[in-house]
Design a protein with these regions (language model features):
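Conserved SAM-binding strand-loop segment of SAM-dependent methyltransferases
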Residues: 123-136
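Short, glycine-/aromatic-enriched active-site segment of Class I SAM-dependent methyltransferases
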Residues: 183-201
């Protein structure tokens, strides 16, 4: 299937999600009809953390809570890939403080508009949202970032290694990548556009996922957390698992 067709389908789906505010996402909890805040809590977010961010930024589209594993420090620069309405950007902004900076990257205009409004309405001065394609070119300078985070986004890309190479490019030496994503027990036997844009068919087998990270030049790629997705049901004939992965430049 053509990569551009897949990318357009993903943009359309997440554009709708940006407009609807949380009823058309790939999270298992959204599929079950749970509210965005409950879906986020079920994905691993701390309930008190959820209360500390703009409620409009919680759309329940994640499959984990990477900020809690990133060990962010005051004054650091952080980039969130596929930042959506901004939940992880705003959580990171609290961790890095006024001397730090958090940049959210998204390819959908609707999500960017929503995130920027959330930032304006809630007085965030250390965040910025930029439009970009994370496989082609992340709009961030080389060697300028302390940490890259992402939540249930890399599975949506058509070339994972290119996305990981872009992450490595923008990270400083010794910088870390901490991402939450979905992986499978084996490669997809066929591709369905709806399932891909729902974070399923683009999910790699776990070993292939880690190999893509290493192929991009990262060191010490390891799984920090692994949890059942959709209660272990087979999706598209595969068992899907949510993982949080860390690697270092």
């Amino acid at each position: 299937m053509e990569k551009d067709v897949i990318k357009q389908k993903v943009k359309e789906r997440y554009g709708r999600l940006g407009l609807s505010g949380g009823s058309d996402c790939c999270s298992s909890d959204c599929c079950s009809g749970d509210s965005p805040d409950k879906a986020a809590a079920n994905a691993g977010y701390d309930v008190q953390d959820l209360k500390s961010v703009p409620q409009e930024s919680i759309i329940g589209a994640g499959c984990g809570a990477p900020v809690g594993f990133a060990n962010l420090q005051k004054g650091e620069t952080v980039v969130d890939l596929g930042s959506g309405a901004g939940i992880d950007v705003f959580l990171s902004a609290k961790s890095v403080g006024g001397a730090g900076q958090v940049i959210g990257i998204d390819m959908t205009d609707e999500m960017l508009e929503k995130a920027r409004k959330n930032a304006r309405d809630n007085g965030y001065s250390n965040v910025e949202f930029r439009k970009g394609d994370i496989e082609a070119r992340i709009p961030v300078d080389d060697n300028s970032v302390d940490a890259v985070i992402s939540n249930c986004v890399i599975n949506l890309t058509t070339n994972k290694t290119d996305a990981f190479k872009e992450m490595r490019r923008i990270l400083k030496s010794g910088g870390r990548m901490v991402i939450s994503d979905l992986v499978a027990d084996r490669k997809a036997s066929s591709i369905d556009l709806e399932r891909w844009s729902s974070c399923i068919d683009g999910a790699l087998a776990k070993d292939d996922y880690l190999a893509s990270i290493r192929m991009a030049g990262f060191k010490d790629a390891r799984v920090l957390e692994e949890r059942e997705f959709m209660k272990g049901e087979l999706i598209g004939g595969r068992k899907i698992t949510s993982i949080i992965v860390k690697a270092v430049k």
